[in-house]
Design a protein with these regions (language model features):
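Long, charged, low-complexity intrinsically disordered regions
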Residues: 33-56, 63
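Conserved mixed alpha/beta catalytic, RNA-binding, or beta-rich assembly cores of soluble enzyme
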Residues: 55-83, 87
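Short helix-coil boundary/hinge micro-motifs
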Residues: 86, 102-111
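Local sequence-structure signature of Cys/Sec-based thiol-disulfide redox active-site neighborhoods
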Residues: 88-95
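Nucleotide-binding motor/catalytic cores of P-loop/tubulin-like NTPases across gene-expression machines
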Residues: 98-104, 119-124
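Short basic, glycine-rich beta-strand/loop surfaces that mediate nucleic-acid
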Residues: 109-159
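Charge-patterned, long linear interaction tracts outside catalytic cores
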Residues: 166-178
Length: 178
């Protein structure tokens, strides 16, 4: 079982998000020896393991986005974003217009910007097919913004895998907002 959220007990095994490294770890049962008592009977397929981890990381990112939205800290859509100046962060979809993005950034001046998130993932959080922009609002009441830090970490994990398929994430997996 992959500990994507980092909450399971024990030492576990860590493998970098590189399919070649995963293949090497799986070769000869090296990974199975560290993860299972029944190493001789356990067959691990590197491609399946990597795709499964990528999917789980993608789900975790969608869940973080949904949680921010439910907390009222994720503003979706360009028109709504423009009404909330000085966001902590700006999320730009992979199909967003470069001209509109530059205009939005110059007007809002967010602290950080994440480019290239799938438009379908952002849209699903908003109960739409796709969405070009979302902004993260600061939590003024908290000295440390744990939810935003978690989102940034989840985006970094998702980028490391690069093969995630966010379009397969839907309400049946529990990542749908509201």
């Amino acid at each position: 079982m992959a500990d994507i959220a980092g909450k399971l007990p024990g030492r576990g095994a860590w493998v970098t998000a590189d399919i070649e490294i995963v293949r090497k770890a799986v070769t000869g049962g090296k990974l199975a020896r560290h993860l299972s008592k029944d190493a001789g009977r356990t067959q691990v397929n590197a491609e399946f393991l990597f795709e499964n981890l990528a999917f789980q990381v993608s789900r975790q990112l969608a869940a973080s986005l949904s949680m921010l939205r439910r907390a009222g800290r994720l503003v979706l859509g360009r028109m709504t974003i423009e009404q909330n100046p000085h966001p902590a962060g700006l999320l730009v979809a992979d199909d967003a217009s470069q001209r509109e993005t530059a205009s939005l950034i110059s007007r809002l001046q967010p602290d950080w910007i994440e480019y290239g998130l799938p438009a379908q993932m952002l849209g699903r959080v908003a109960s739409r097919v796709s969405l070009a922009y979302a902004s993260v609002i600061r939590d003024a009441a908290a000295p440390e913004d744990v939810m935003t830090d978690r989102l940034v970490a989840d985006i970094a994990y998702w980028r490391a895998f690069g093969t995630a398929q966010p379009d397969k994430i839907g309400p049946e997996e529990g990542c749908h907002a509201d």
